[in-house]
Amino acid sequence: MEWLSQPAPLVAPALLGMVLVRQFADGLQVRAQIVETEAYTAGDPACHAYRRKTQRNQVMFGPPGHLYIYRIYGLYHCLNIVTEPEGIPAAVLIRAAQLDRLPDWIPANKQNQPARAAAGPGLLCQALRIDGSHNGWRLERAEAGQEGIWLEGSPSWQTQLSIVQTTRIGITQGAEIPWRWYIGGHPAVSRY
């Protein structure tokens, strides 16, 4: 997946329609079609690495194809895929996805609205049971009996999707930058 070494604003829309696979040690796999993304890069005031490299954001500095997981509001985890060549801090936030199945740990109030089970970055991580322990993981297919997280499918520039580009949401700095993409009309896009 060398294409992940491109700038985050190119990778973010390309991830739409691809499938994020989460494999658990017991062999269970949950697939989530990516329907919404946001890009964050060096020089962007909303980027966690805007000021400097820290222990918290060091994964953003590469190499590309690794996971940058952080917690927001002290409650929810967010999943990002690191992009750009090593040394340049950048990542794509996976804001929302459509699950192929609802695991039994999904709360009952989400069972009647399956498209909404991962319709936001915190919900996505809850649905895939991704937390801070996954920070720094490499996106790669796991062998049977091992945990793993990887991508399947082709970048969206190779498919026919109705992609909408707009400004990012839920941030106070850099909110005017149009680095949010989503699949138009998809029921799993976050409502933020």
Curated annotation (Swiss-Prot):
Keywords: DNA damage, DNA repair, Hydrolase. It comes from the Bacteria. GO terms for molecular function: alkylbase DNA N-glycosylase activity; DNA binding. GO terms for biological process: base-excision repair. InterPro entries: Formyl_transferase-like_C_sf, MPG, MPG_sf. The keyword Signal does not apply. Gene3D superfamilies: Methylpurine-DNA glycosylase (MPG). Its EC number is 3.2.2.-. Belongs to the DNA glycosylase MPG family. NCBIfam families: 3mg. This is Putative 3-methyladenine DNA glycosylase. It comes from Synechococcus sp. (strain JA-2-3B'a(2-13)).
